[in-house]
A protein has these predicted regions:
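The feature captures the catalytic groove of carbohydrate-active enzymes
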Residues: 194-216, 230, 237-239, 342-365, ...
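Hydrophobic core/packing positions within alpha-helical solenoid repeats
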Residues: 315-318, 366, 370
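Active-site flanking loop/helix segments enriched in acidic
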Residues: 295-302
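Aromatic-lined, polymer-binding surfaces characteristic
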Residues: 271-278, 284-292, 304-307, 334-367, ...
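An acidic intrinsically disordered interaction segment
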Residues: 78-90, 185-195, 266-287, 325-337, ...
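Alpha-helical support elements that line or immediately flank enzyme active sites
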Residues: 302-338
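Extended, well-ordered alpha-helical scaffold segments
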Residues: 244-264, 270, 274-281, 323-337, ...
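Terminal accessory carbohydrate-recognition/targeting modules of carbohydrate-active enzymes
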Residues: 1-267, 302, 309, 320, ...
Length: 442
């Protein structure tokens, strides 16, 4: 679907989310027997041929791409999954392909706290000389939109094994694609047109998208050899110096990710296979909010960002059950900074606009989250944290709900809370079409 890709970068966390690196397509070419020569890769005739942009005679080609396209009104498929022998996920994604005498292992992970996607390849070539061709597919679109060829306007530069793309719409931002080795050449066609996204089709749209692929990278795989290849795609400031891929390889980032995942399990303290998967899944919803400098919860992922009600409902499971005390405190602080007239924000828009406050229950859920925090951490430090940072806001909420605040929220004589009137949408059932509120909860 449109929300998926190897790297969706947040330019102003947690908003302004752009798909920048859609995927990478791989193919393996096995060369014919006459392509022989020096055992030294630098002086091998195939290496020289590839540098000249020519293609040696091949005996077999294995296309590992798995995708779906719309062509001439028909749905077409590439069948790379036929070579896939295993898949696993442990915080990183792991594929193993078997193509003839070549075993290719592909590991994908994201660098924690950065807009960086790392791909680590391990290749065992037990057959004759061969090559790996990589075709990266780029984009620069809002994560729920789609693209056409006319949408791509990049300033492109290629220095050694570093390809830099600067979108004209965001000249202060650059997409940096780097490989540890390989020969870059122009890719034809330059656009991957009419890729069909099946989930979007199921939602009764055409589900068509387009990606930008100006270059391909060819890596020589000598006979009877083992190789490790690093690929990085990063979003950096346009004036930032290129990083050295040899100083922080994809394999280094993969190891960092393994350590981070292990630390999540240790912090949670739950030694159970199923619980570990929940701990790992919970981590994906926690992120930084630049406007506060604290953590928040992407409770509406992938469609929405941090909603007050959803965040407070998810708060206990995501942070307290997993032992993430500091993150729990930061989330409470994030929302405390935006309380207005005694109301916790309903949502933070995805365009850096001011929060919306049309909610009757987010503030009440906030009380519940604070209470849960104190139940999990019944110590002096927790009491002090709440007393100093949270308690004044709780009093503000009580006063506002008692005496009356926005959206007709006030306490009736019987002690029950009245909320909403007219066109107000103040509960989770908030559908409104023009002047018609579908399910008013006033």
């Amino acid at each position: 679907r449109t929300h998926q890709g190897y790297l969706i970068a947040s330019l102003h966390p947690p908003i302004e989310r752009y798909l920048v690196f859609s995927k990478i397509n791989e193919s393996l070419s096995v060369f014919a027997a006459e392509n022989t020569g020096s055992s030294d890769e630098k002086f091998h005739p195939i290496t020289d041929t590839l540098k000249k942009g020519s293609v040696p005679a091949v005996s077999a080609v294995y296309n590992l791409e798995t995708s779906q396209h719309k062509k001439n009104g028909e749905t077409c498929y590439t069948q790379g999954q036929e070579y896939l022998v295993s898949f696993s996920y442990d915080g990183s994604v792991h594929y193993t392909y078997q193509a003839g005498d070549i075993t290719l292992k592909k590991h994908i992970c994201l660098k924690h706290g950065a807009n960086v996607c790392a791909i680590a390849y391990e290749i065992e070539n037990n057959g004759p000389d061969a090559s790996l061709t990589l075709v990266p597919l780029f984009n620069f679109r809002e994560h729920s939109a789609s693209s056409r060829p006319e949408d791509f306007h990049f300033r492109t530069s290629l220095i050694d094994n570093s390809l830099c793309l600067i979108p004209e719409s965001h000249p202060d931002t650059a997409i940096l694609f780097q490989t540890s080795e390989g020969i870059f050449s122009d890719h034809t066609p330059m656009f991957d047109i009419d890729m069909q996204l099946q989930t979007e089709v199921d939602l009764e749209t055409d589900g068509l998208d387009c990606h930008y692929c100006p270059h391909e990278v060819t890596v020589f795989l000598p006979a009877k050899s083992h190789k490790q290849i690093s690929v990085l795609c990063s979003v950096i400031a346009a004036d930032e110096t290129f990083t050295d891929i040899t100083a922080d390889t994809a394999f280094d980032i993969l190891k960092e990710r393994e350590k981070y995942t292990k630390s999540l399990y240790e912090t949670a303290g739950i030694h159970d296979d199923f619980a570990d998967r929940l701990v790992l899944a919970a981590d994906q919803f926690l992120c930084d909010r630049a406007s506060t400098g604290y953590k928040t919860v992407l409770a509406g992922l992938p469609w929405f960002t941090d909603w007050g009600r959803d965040t407070m409902i998810a708060f206990t499971g995501l942070t307290l059950c997993t032992g993430r005390r500091k993150d729990a405190e930061e989330i409470l602080l994030t929302f405390s900074k935006y309380i207005r007239h005694g109301i916790v924000p309903n949502m933070f828009p995805d365009d850096n606009a001011a929060p919306l406050y049309n909610t009757a229950d987010a503030s009440l859920w906030y009380f519940y989250a604070v209470w849960q925090y104190l139940q999990y951490y019944p110590d002096t430090a927790a009491n002090a944290f709440v007393q100093e940072n949270i308690y004044p806001h709780l009093k503000e909420i009580i006063s506002a709900y008692k005496n009356g605040t926005d959206f007709s929220i006030y306490m009736e004589e019987d002690g029950l809370i009245h909320a909403g009137s007219g066109l107000d949408q103040i509960t989770w059932m908030d559908v409104r079409v023009g002047d018609w509120v579908a399910t008013p909860r006033h």
